[in-house]
């Protein structure tokens, strides 16, 4: 089993000058991580976790949290982190990828040589020693065995944790400056001194030969740990300055950490080449070579190097003025530069819709693009809002005392409407064209009046919560480009905040127009905060998931009051649209009893369970008007959930699905009456021949509100390929007017998608959206197709790669067989080779017969029966064995087909079979 520890060793860079020892029992009831965080802000340079009563699992969890705090403070490369006594826990944590730099052991703990053998040569090992004689014995240890010594106590203390770094001999003896210097001179290792240390000791300690001081209570027990740490650090530096101690010699005398040696056998030593595996037969060697080649292709296809080089985000400045202000709107687009056509001239760059957003530091978040637009209208107010509490992040956060990775970037006070709804629908209905509408019109290449009128009629929605000013306005409606949503979010089983932010960035890079955070696991509130502050696209949620987490997954404990509080919490954070399963009514639940797959919607099943347990109507339905009033204050759009959607083809279009749809039509009108934007969620599994019926039924029942569908999947037989089965249905339903398609990844029905699954799902659905736009005859929909076709015909290979939705996969597949750079200028690919390339042959035909005048002359002569020079050449080619064919007219083709059909029928054949047959 290989060592998974990914971090560089700190054995040559740790700083003992401000060494903070801490455990949960030292923090006076405050969260351990909060105290560590404050100590780091105050200048602590070394952290030791000491929790004598904790078991290995608890210590590992604490270590993970402390390592995350150090990372959040951007000090992972400057502040070392060790665990007291438990080398076994350090070993386990490092194998889990947690940044624990080493262990500190006492005289009664693990023998130093054993600790070094267990942890390997990269870990820090510290050792306690209280006397000069003990230090001299430690010097006899093999070179490279330990890295520093902890000596103490400086003062008599009744609390054992402060007696010394690693433990006390119980003698009660203390150290003075002379004794400290004696120990330091005797030691071959840097020495850190502590035990009852306070700020008053700093000048004396800094004047000795000690490398630094260690402390527990003076910081952990202080009213303000940050200020206490800062005072001590400044006192030390006033005498010592920034001068650092030296390091023990690094002599590698041990093997790597236990259990890694076997995994590293045969691996290359530093500075040497890896030894290739030898094979006993040619077949094994060829198979290994093929596998290695395929792995290289797969790795290249999973990246974005070529895409990032070719797809450049730019902005177009659009002046905008209305009664509330004047602005220069910087509207984004993607520019793809194209090469020249050989012998003809330059090709203009291709401009495409951009969803990626500007680059930013994820820890700081995006700039609030729309904040001035929102404030200048004068119809909102700032207010304090509800206070976030640990319950918002779930039961594990309550136990831990904090989220695993707190948001420390830009903070904002929540805003809400003052006197009237502040939705884009309200403005549109009052004839006000907002900056958001002009921004969208520029992105869509359409007239702004089309945007306003579609919003006013409810045929389009613009999800843009005033508390998410970072989002770039976009529109969802059948009159506009078909949009794509990507789902993500953690679960109770897997993922982290960093992974979810990375998935967000990855999804928008490849073209996601909106993202839904469907987190159901750890840190729901904080994960959402990170996502919102970093998202250039609207964010949707299902608030029921967080509400259920707050009642520890017991649906019977849900209430309207708890749900309302959760909705307001998310409105204040900036969620742009919310899935509300208000159409799952008590009387509809029995209709699902005989389904093959029952109720597959998580939100729908939660509400069905609540209705049955209480035998009451859904509080989402009975309090729907109150939800409308809340949404109108923040401009949050409804995504009316299809809680009774079919989860298999066998259940499609049944009474439960259609009954819920009728209720969603009623709720749409109720929301519109309060100027709240609405879109309707659609079915997930539908036979292909009923896809069109579903969209047409939704339009009729829900008054042309935008339809938002998951796929639909058109077969249930392809786990692992449901991004394909669903993209087929998505293209068809998009063709007939579905406004937004929710992607499906290869992991659908199988597990939580990772980064590569997200890319696969987004690309599949970008293709579906684009195909639907072409089928709808959307203006300019075929521009990209025409550009790439022209590049293909002209053998401009790089332009072909760059104009594709996934340049990295395209170039990886091409280079799989033709990797040489000259092949990217060749007039063939590996499919046909240089002699049989249809494009090359077609170019020769164009050279011979191209030009409008030549074409007209050929047609004229052929119609007149004249054997032109061109026709004579064609006949000569046939005579010489060159494959050719006479071109039949449409009439001749039809006549020939009829004749063949008659012959087939006369022989007893049947052209078509009935369903019974």
From Swiss-Prot:
One term under GO cellular component: cytosol
Binding site for Zn(2+): 685, 749
InterPro entries in the record: Aldolase_TIM, ThiamineP_synth_sf, ThiamineP_synth_TenI, ThiC, ThiC/Bza_core_dom, ThiC/BzaA/B, TMP_synthase
Source species, domain of life: Bacteria
Chain positions recorded as 2-[(2R,5Z)-2-carboxy-4-methylthiazol-5(2H)-ylidene]ethyl phosphate binding sites: 157-159, 196, 216-217
One Gene Ontology MF term: carbon-carbon lyase activity
Positions of Mg(2+) binding: 85, 109
Cofactor(s) demanded: [4Fe-4S] cluster
Name the record gives this protein: Thiamine biosynthesis bifunctional protein ThiEC
């Amino acid at each position: 089993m290989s060592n998974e520890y990914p971090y560089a060793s700190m054995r040559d860079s740790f700083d003992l000058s401000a060494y903070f020892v801490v455990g949960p029992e030292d923090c006076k009831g405050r969260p351990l991580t909060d105290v560590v965080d404050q100590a780091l802000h105050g200048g602590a340079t070394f952290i030791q976790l000491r929790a004598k009563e904790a078991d290995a699992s608890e210590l590992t969890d604490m270590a993970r949290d402390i390592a995350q705090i150090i990372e959040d403070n951007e000090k992972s490369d400057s502040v070392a982190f060790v665990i007291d006594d438990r080398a076994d826990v350090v070993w386990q944590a490092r194998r889990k990828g947690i940044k624990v730099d080493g262990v500190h052991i006492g005289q009664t703990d693990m023998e130093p040589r054993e600790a070094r053998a267990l942890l390997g040569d990269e870990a820090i090992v510290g050792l306690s020693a209280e006397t000069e004689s003990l230090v001299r014995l430690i010097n006899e240890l093999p070179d490279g065995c330990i890295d520093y010594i902890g000596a103490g106590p400086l003062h008599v203390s009744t609390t054992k944790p402060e007696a010394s770094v690693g433990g006390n001999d119980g003698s009660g003896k203390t150290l003075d400056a002379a004794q400290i210097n004696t120990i330091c001179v005797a030691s071959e290792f840097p020495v850190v001194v502590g035990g009852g240390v306070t700020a008053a000791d700093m000048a004396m300690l800094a004047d000795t030969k000690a490398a630094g001081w260690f402390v527990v209570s003076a910081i952990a027990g202080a009213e303000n740990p940050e200020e206490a740490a800062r005072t001590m650090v400044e006192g030390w530096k006033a005498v010592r300055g920034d001068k650092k101690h030296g390091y023990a010699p690094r002599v590698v005398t041990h093997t790597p950490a236990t259990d890694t040696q076997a995994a590293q056998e045969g691996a290359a030593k530093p500075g040497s080449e890896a030894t290739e595996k030898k094979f006993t037969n040619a077949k094994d060697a060829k198979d290994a070579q093929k596998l290695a080649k395929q792995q290289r292709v797969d790795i290249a296809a999973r990246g974005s190097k070529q895409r990032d080089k070719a797809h450049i985000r730019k902005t177009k400045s659009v002046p905008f003025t209305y009664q509330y202000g004047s602005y220069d709107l910087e509207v984004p687009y993607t520019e793809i530069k194209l090469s020249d056509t050989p012998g003809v001239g330059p090709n203009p760059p291709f401009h495409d819709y951009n969803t990626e957003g500007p680059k930013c530091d994820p820890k700081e978040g995006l700039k609030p693009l729309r904040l001035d637009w929102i404030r200048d209208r004068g119809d909102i107010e700032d207010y304090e809002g509800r206070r976030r509490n640990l319950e918002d992040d779930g039961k594990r956060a309550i136990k831990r005392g904090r989220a695993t990775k707190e948001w420390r970037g830009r903070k904002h006070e929540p805003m809400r409407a003052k006197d009237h709804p502040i939705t884009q629908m309200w403005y549109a209905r009052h004839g006000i064209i907002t900056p958001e509408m002009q921004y969208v019109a520029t992105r869509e290449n359409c007239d702004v009046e089309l945007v306003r009128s579609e919003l006013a009629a409810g045929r389009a929605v613009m999800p843009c919560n005033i508390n998410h000013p970072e989002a770039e306005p976009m529109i969802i409606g059948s009159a506009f480009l078909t949009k794509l949503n990507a789902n993500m979010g953690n679960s109770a089983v897997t993922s982290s905040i960093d992974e979810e932010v990375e998935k967000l960035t990855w999804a928008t890079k490849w073209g996601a127009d909106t993202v839904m955070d469907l987190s159901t696991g750890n840190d729901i509130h904080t994960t959402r905060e990170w996502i919102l502050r970093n998202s250039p696209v609207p964010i949707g949620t299902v608030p029921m998931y967080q509400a259920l987490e707050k009642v520890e997954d017991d649906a019977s404990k849900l209430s309207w009051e708890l749900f309302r509080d959760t909705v307001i919490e998310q409105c204040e954070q900036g969620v742009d649209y919310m899935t509300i399963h208000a159409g799952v009514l008590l009387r509809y639940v029995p209709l699902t009893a005989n389904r093959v797959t029952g109720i597959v919607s998580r939100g729908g099943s939660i509400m069905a369970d609540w209705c049955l347990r209480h035998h009451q109507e859904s509080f989402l339905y009975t309090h729907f008007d109150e939800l409308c009033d809340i949404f109108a204050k923040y401009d949050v759009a409804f995504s009316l959930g299809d809680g009774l959607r079919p989860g298999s083809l066998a259940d499609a279009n049944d009474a439960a699905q259609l009954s819920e749809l009728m209720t969603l039509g009623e709720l749409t009108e109720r929301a519109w009456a309060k100027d709240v934007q609405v879109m309707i969620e659609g079915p997930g599994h539908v036979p292909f021949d009923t896809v069109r019926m579903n969209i047409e039924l939704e339009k009729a029942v829900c008054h042309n509100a935008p339809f938002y569908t998951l796929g639909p999947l058109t077969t249930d037989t392809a786990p692992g390929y449901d991004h394909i089965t669903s993209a087929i249905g998505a293209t068809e339903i998009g063709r007939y007017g579905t406004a937004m398609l929710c992607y499906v990844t290869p992991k659908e029905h199988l597990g939580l998608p990772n980064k590569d699954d997200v890319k696969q799902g987004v690309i599949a659905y970008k293709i579906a959206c684009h195909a639907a736009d072409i089928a709808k005859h959307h203006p300019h929909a075929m521009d990209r197709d025409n550009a790439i076709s022209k590049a293909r015909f002209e053998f401009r290979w790089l332009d072909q790669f760059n104009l594709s939705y996934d340049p990295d996969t395209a170039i990886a597949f091409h280079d799989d067989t033709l990797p040489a750079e000259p092949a990217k200028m060749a007039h063939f690919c590996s499919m046909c080779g240089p002699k049989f390339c249809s494009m090359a042959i077609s170019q020769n035909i164009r050279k011979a017969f191209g030009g409008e005048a030549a074409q007209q002359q050929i047609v004229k002569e052929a119609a007149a029966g004249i054997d032109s020079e061109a026709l004579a050449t064609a006949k000569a080619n046939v005579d010489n064995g060159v494959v050719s064919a006479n071109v039949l007219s449409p009439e001749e083709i039809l006549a020939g087909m009829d004749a063949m059909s008659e012959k087939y029928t006369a022989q007893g054949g049947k052209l078509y079979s009935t369903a019974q047959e």
